[in-house]
């Protein structure tokens, strides 16, 4: 991470997330197998999905494809969309359930790991999305360059598999202007 910050290595959110999780797991994580391979495979599928559906005409085709990949069963995600993990399999002091590597592997996660996983797939695909934070929560935002939504920015609530208007996010999280 220091090399990225000092300009000695290219900036990579994927590599930074991997390094943090690798350290947390005492080195029991493989960058290629656990991060690169599944993300590259997913991005390759998304490129084909865009082409087959003729979504290239949309400036936000990559974002549309990502939402489909995360929300709906398809061959590219093994017929297993990414879902909120309601299980309580880890105690409160065990953060493994929050890890992006776990979400990539089992397609289940929390309000931290699901949006970060989306961001890593977006980075590989070249889709311009941003991580947005609310109190104790995280979601995805991207500019609506195709005017498909009533607002200039699209808020993607990965944990609920839906789009959220800005007013709803502000109301739910008690955010003011």
Identify the role of each PLM range.
Residues 1-177:
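A structural boundary/capping signal
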């Amino acid at each position: 991470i220091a090399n990225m910050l000092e300009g000695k290595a290219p900036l990579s959110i994927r590599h930074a997330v991997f390094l943090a999780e690798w350290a947390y797991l005492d080195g029991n994580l493989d960058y290629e197998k656990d991060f690169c391979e599944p993300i590259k495979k997913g991005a390759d599928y998304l490129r084909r999905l865009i082409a087959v559906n003729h979504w290239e005409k949309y400036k936000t085709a990559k974002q549309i494809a990502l939402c489909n990949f995360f929300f709906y069963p398809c061959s590219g995600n093994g017929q297993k969309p990414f879902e909120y993990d309601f299980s309580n399999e880890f105690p409160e002091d065990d953060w493994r359930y929050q890890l992006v590597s776990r979400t990539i592997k089992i397609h289940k996660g929390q309000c931290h790991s699901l949006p970060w996983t989306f961001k890593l797939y977006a980075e590989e695909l070249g889709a311009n999305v941003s991580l947005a934070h609310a109190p104790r929560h995280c979601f995805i935002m991207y500019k609506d360059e195709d005017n498909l939504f009533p607002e200039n920015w699209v808020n993607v609530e990965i944990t609920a598999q839906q789009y959220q208007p800005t007013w709803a996010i502000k109301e739910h999280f008690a955010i003011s202007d």
